[in-house]
Amino acid sequence: MDYLNDSNLSEIFQSGFKPFHSTETALVKVMNDILIATDHGKYAVLVLLDMTAAFDTVDHDLLISRLQHCVGISGLALLWLKSYLFNRTFCVKLGSASSSVAPLLWGVPQGSILGPLLFSLYLLPLGAIFRKHGVPFHLYADDCQLYLPFSLSDSLPTRPLLDCLTDVKAWMAKNFLNFNDRKTEAILFGPNRSSHTPDVDLAALTSQLKSSITNLGVKIDSALTFDDHVNGVVKSAFYHLRRLSKVKPFLSKRDLESVIHAFITSRLDYCNSLLIGVGQGTLSRLQLVQNAAARFLTGRRKFDHITPILASLHWLPIEFRIRFKVLLLVFKSLNSLAPVYLADLLKPHVPTRSLRSAEQLLLSVPKSRRKLRGDRAFSVAAPMLWNNLPLHIRQATSVPVFKSLLKTYFYSLAFNSVGN
């Protein structure tokens, strides 16, 4: 992996199974681009491609050729990879009965460390196709999404996307990957929530347009409210709280809190940086979940004041958890601990003349037009939050120090009235 990164051989927009990358960083980048485009009055179409059993259909000869000619692997290293891929067998066993042994002629070994990496290298030529057509894209292992901002005044605005899809299908067929048209989904975003569906040619994608899609575990709606996602989180969290009530009598408070974090908090925090700037009504539903979990853990009654309970548990409220995640991504981006595609969204503030502000580690805040569009984009919201932090937090020397200082600061903001 170090060789691939140092040699700039890995796809920059492939976020699967790479250090400092995650589903969240991938979605932050994609949603940033879409929010900025719609903030500028454009429409944007997002397409989620489906590859059926992609890991199982990799052609070994093509993969070896790719490793040799695209990645530059040769000699003993290439021979070792050949021995790893070829002459593999499998059988099916049920109880004491088993099938005859059969050769595995295709696919990368699943469940292995090398499998996902080899698959991502197998997909390397896809990036050139997307770039040829000028279509932004992002990959997470075998999850592939491409999106295109466009203006209604453009001539044939969706033509680059449609031509790109044609080439992608041809490439996949040539490389023994099964492109599943029926499971491919598309969603259209407008400049505002009430935007009408534009009269543009989406060809076969028209029948696959949805008002809401699930992208890397996050439900995204065409109005960008994230209401569908929040509703799903709330429903799932309360379901698990009800289930936990059955085991609560058998767990210590410490163990119960760990279980709550595993089943409830993890859902509240998953990709929560995408929720920066959403409406208070949306966040309040998530806050109800956290409040219920806090009362469940402490045995407090439904109508007991929640703020002292959260303070005693040292649980930051939902809105502060969202800000915390965004600022953590900023700190990591500024310290080479995040994907390059996120770091590129942040620019240092350059004062017009020599001022003390040059030493404040401030970021430039791009101008935006709409509170519910541009202001929510990572490239806008993140610098605004960062610049409002006290200097000693921005000057933190490591991730643990930054997280500790930031939590202490947010704790004081969230619970400053507790105990007064």
How would you name each of these model-derived features?
Residues M1-N420:
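Hydrophobic/basic alpha-helical segments
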